[in-house]
Amino acid sequence: MSDNKTGNGTSRRAFLRGATAAGAGVMTAGAAKAQSADPLITERQDWASYLGTGVDEVPYGMPIEFESNVVRRNVEWLTASPISSINFTPIHALEGTITPQGCAFERHHSGAIEMRKEDYRLMINGLVEKPLVFNYDDIERFPRENHVYFCECAANTGMEWAGAQLNGVQFTHGMIHNMEYTGVPLRTLLQEAGADMSLDKWVYVEGADASSNGRSIPMEKALDDVLVAFKANGEALRMEHGYPVRLIVPGWEGNMWIKWIRRIEVVDRAVESREETSKYTEVYEDGTARKWTWVMDAKSVITSPSPQMPIKHGPGQMVISGLAWSGHGQITRVDVSKDGGITWETARLGKQGDTKALTRFYLDTQWDGAPMLLQARAMDDTGYVQPTKDQLRAERGENGVYHNNCIQTWYVNAEGISENVEVS
């Protein structure tokens, strides 16, 4: 074990020396403390002295002003323009697993577009017996399904590949959301058109926005769990999430989830579009390219404590919480380390639903006030174990961007303030 460190890195040996010294004289405290009379309890407050807001004041419910900081945020220097850019879900401030549409990250290639349901058309062509054009009402007539799935951008955590970069879990891991979608299985629409559904065929799905964003999907996946969705979390899709209709490709990278879908073409082979050649592929140091890397491997991150969620209560009882997910299926276990990966404790998993959806995990523990190096490590039902960053670098080199599912480390100091670091 080395004492070397670079950038925001730290060594496990140096950390253990500091933690032992910091925690030597700390006494633990209970979750609640006895105190003198609190005027918020003993005195009548303004909100109990006048009538509140009527039922018609806010026809569509909005968050209260005291939660106005729980919003999507972008990194201004990341892209040249917000029109072709991305912002980040405030996962540090959310609980459970369902992401409100208004908090769910956005990724656009030419900006979000406005389209009325009445103007919506979806064409299915190519290797089909009868090319069809559906309007919005047509799609709603087919048998529908409801499923909860996560959507993760392939570049989520991509800026962290070279080292600890951004000091906030919203920015390191916030290119993800998890919503309940209502839609029609893609296979239903393909059957309606008499498509050639041989497993050696592909479908090419194209969006209606100015970028004409499109991706090729193997027929085997298209016939499995892909949805043509028109609702999210029980309501119409928001504009930024593809209103009125988008594609849902469970477990696969977010670029496949085409928004405002206008055309589905059945083809003999992959189209090799811009988004699957010059984009969303990675070139190794030996010149070979890594492509068709659709599935998002098992990943987890601690959301609290984290740089945007300091420990405010001091030593004593605490809950370490986070999120885990896998594009291969379901999370079966999450381990948490408080010493940078030297020792691990198994976390408690929240109630699970659909596969390929977020899982909430908790470690109910005690904090003695000493510094911590917090990590989470996820496992899924295929037996896959979330790797360290060094393991990913050994496999893919130093210049990766996409599919970074490495273990994340937060350094928590004696004051409860967290920082993004990399351990070696």
Report residues per predicted region.
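N-terminal secretory signal peptides
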Residues: M1-A14, G23, A29, Q35
